[in-house]
């Protein structure tokens, strides 16, 4: 499980923080928009990604796909998509979270992703590393929808922005979290952010009307998250006027 400690991280987003609109598949379409800090301007990457991950500590294994156990199969990154444009028509990333979140009774994530025209199937460690290389090569904030499987048939979509300027991952907590496996799913997200994206911290945003809010906050604090002031440098400056969300910071030890 990821470790935590206090790090000093730089401010990034302004009141022009972005929102993503999703179509039925959960993949973003649309326009490019500029976001900024008080001292500099940062442009969102024109590309966005959607990746599929499973619950478990082993993200990629050298065991052949068709010979995996259920646990190994769930841990495999089996597909991703990349879009050449993103929709940031207004509002904030967090407002789009509940619309992006979903539970599905689809087939396995490989076949589900392959139903989209711009999907790439991943069946080797080299493929997985190439996806990470493409994501990490961006020097501008890039939007990533992380499809986290609770089982092979149920998943939630997590709307995130990876900001290389301050090396933070901004995550909007989905409104509808499955009761079964939600803790392990969340731990999987933390492990992916720390071990694969190698971020310095995670800023989690929770709507104040989040179902089962008290239990989730208790779980966050237990895992090492700390309440984050809306005026803190790690929070997007748009948070100063945001009365609808709670902010939490998870700092990752180097």
Swiss-Prot record:
Q: Name one GO cellular component term.
A: nucleoplasm
A Pfam family per the record: ODC_AZ
- In terms of superkingdom, the source organism counts as Eukaryota
**Molecular functions (GO terms):** ornithine decarboxylase inhibitor activity
| UniProt entry tagged with the keyword Hydrolase | no
Q: Which UniProt keywords apply?
A: Developmental protein
Is the Oxidoreductase keyword given for this protein?
A: no
* Record's subunit section: Interacts with ODC1 and thereby sterically blocks ODC homodimerization.
Role this protein plays: Ornithine decarboxylase (ODC) antizyme protein that negatively regulates ODC activity and intracellular polyamine biosynthesis and uptake in response to increased intracellular polyamine levels. Binds to ODC monomers, inhibiting the assembly of the functional ODC homodimer, and targets the monomers for ubiquitin-independent proteolytic destruction by the 26S proteasome. Required for cellular differentiation in neuronal and myogenic lineages during embryonic development.
- The name of this protein is Ornithine decarboxylase antizyme
């Amino acid at each position: 499980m990821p470790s935590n400690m206090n790090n000093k991280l730089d401010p990034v987003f302004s009141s022009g923080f972005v929102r993503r609109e999703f179509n039925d598949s959960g993949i973003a379409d649309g326009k490019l928009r500029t976001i900024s800090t008080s001292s500099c301007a940062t442009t969102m990457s024109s590309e966005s990604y959607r990746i599929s991950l499973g619950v478990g500590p082993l993200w990629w294994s050298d065991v052949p796909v068709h010979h995996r156990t259920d646990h190994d199969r769930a841990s495999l990154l089996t597909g991703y998509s990349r879009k050449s444009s993103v929709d940031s028509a207004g509002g904030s990333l967090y407002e789009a979270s509940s619309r992006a979140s979903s539970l599905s009774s689809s087939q396995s994530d490989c076949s589900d992703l392959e139903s989209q025209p711009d999907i790439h199937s991943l069946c080797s460690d080299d493929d997985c590393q190439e996806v990470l290389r493409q994501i990490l090569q961006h020097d501008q904030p890039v939007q990533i929808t992380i499809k986290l499987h609770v089982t092979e048939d149920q998943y939630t979509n997590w709307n995130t922005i990876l900001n290389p300027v301050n090396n933070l991952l901004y995550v909007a907590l989905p409104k509808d979290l499955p009761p079964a496996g939600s803790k392990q799913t969340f731990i999987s997200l933390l492990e992916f952010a720390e071990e694969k994206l190698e971020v310095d911290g995670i800023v989690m945003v929770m709507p104040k009307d989040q179902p089962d809010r008290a239990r989730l906050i208790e779980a966050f604090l237990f895992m090492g998250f700390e309440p984050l002031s809306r005026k803190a440098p790690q929070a997007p400056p748009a948070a100063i006027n945001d009365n609808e969300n709670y902010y939490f910071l998870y700092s990752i030890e180097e």
